[in-house]
Amino acid sequence: MAAESLRIATRRSQLAMWQAEHIAAELQRLHPGLEVELVPMSTRGDEILDQPLARIGGKGLFMKELEDGMLRGEADLAVHSMKDIPWRLPEGFDLAAVSDRADPRDAFVSNHYSDLDELPHGARVGTASLRRQCQIMDRRPDLQIEVLRGNVQTRLRKLDDGVYDAIILAASGLDRLELTHRIAGRLTPEQSLPAVGQGALGIECREGDERVMKLVEGLNHEATRIRINAERGMNARLEGSCQVPIGGYAELDGDEVHLRGLVGAIDGSEVIRGEIRGPAAEAENLGRQLGDDLLARGADRILKAVAEQQ
């Protein structure tokens, strides 16, 4: 009998390949003898680097080509950073599993400064994230925020070339690429509330593909899934994506989930924050409740203004 096999669609960047290889190794650990093939693909989001993501369609651009590959039968599943997965998946796809979460924090990376507060007046900070921009501007309105796109190595090279005084990246990505030594400091959630799902990996497959779902179910990390259900519940209520400055971070304390969320103006002139606690079994509903609270306190007005700016 032929050995069982799986094909994993992945972006071509070094970080994306690491993530796919990590999931492949975990699958082979769970299923000895399983043959796993990586199917690298180029995405529009990787190719268009001279414009902000929000202007060219958001982070769904990192997924569409991988999803098309699954529909064509070229791959059985795709591995994504959870923060890149929209709150609503396209019809015909399921989120089959969510991996154990790595460090969800943002990393402050600089060759000359150890902390955001140490940056001099007018310093140039590179980031591709409206969420990060909003929170930095709220804390340090004197800084110059500039768009920074490209893979991790490209962003670090621009920092080293002196284009920026500091850049902000996901700590988990630097850790995974063994670049922890480049991190000058890890921003607390109070300094920079993480993106919804940041630090976890999501496994997407075709809806109703029971074979694949059964093979990957052992990768699902229940505690992480509960936390991310809360965060994505809030995001769903806000109809959020990378096109708007939204942060969401949930923590588990026994059977209780504690969710913090924020919505802010791009320039940091207004940031609405909220939090909620409740039973972990109701995580997604709690997220929706927090989303409603943020909307009632003005998030709807901010989100409308952000949409008009794009």
From Swiss-Prot:
Keyword Transit peptide: no
Organism annotation: Halorhodospira halophila (strain DSM 244 / SL1)
UniProt remark on cofactor binding: Binds 1 dipyrromethane group covalently.
Enzyme category, top tier: transferase
InterPro entries registered for this protein in UniProt: HemC (IPR000860), Porphobilin_deaminase_cofac_BS (IPR022419), Porphobilin_deaminase_N (IPR022417), Porphobilinogen_deaminase_C (IPR022418), Porphobilinogen_deaminase_C_sf (IPR036803)
Key words of the record: Porphyrin biosynthesis, Transferase
Matches recorded under Pfam families: Porphobil_deam (PF01379), Porphobil_deamC (PF03900)
Listed name of the protein: Porphobilinogen deaminase
Gene: hemC
